């Protein structure tokens, strides 16, 4: 996964003065009551000012490096405008390290100016919000939302094909069978629920292995969740009895992360 590769790369980097790495964790979540007035901008300005003041007195060469970093970061933030994620993380050096990370999970605002990247908080978030597949079920439809660190990486939607008795990607280019009446489809699914969800369980196990999902969460009716749980090899982290298949995916993830 990209975030794991980045952590592995950065943890072995060590610079020599005056070149250092700015590790910045910035809470930009507008849903946070303490961020309603854009307080992150104040925190950012204040943090840079304190660091600059310290370096001006201790090492003017490092201060110059910080000035270059600050200019580049300001340009990046200005280009984002109001399209802000919940959090931003930066690992930046004057010599060319430039790793901005947008997150949809909260962080504690912190500044670090050291010869190595300070990765503790990012590693902690990686453990708290692992690679997770949220499986939303509703009758003959299933949606899979893949996330890492709370960020949506991929979305797949499947519908049950009653003629071929198989699950098909609803965005597939394969020709679909003629539509059946909704009540007939529901009757078929109800009568054959155990069998058809057993097939889905086998498919999910294959996906979980191929994509290295670390956690799976099922949201839907209890009976369906129990059938999938019973027939899957990979354990289900949690089962949530809510019908969320047709809701906005970002809101769904925000909601399920809290419950899972």
UniProtKB/Swiss-Prot annotation:
InterPro entries linked: Bact_RF_family5
Origin: domain of life: Bacteria
Protein name: Uncharacterized protein YocB
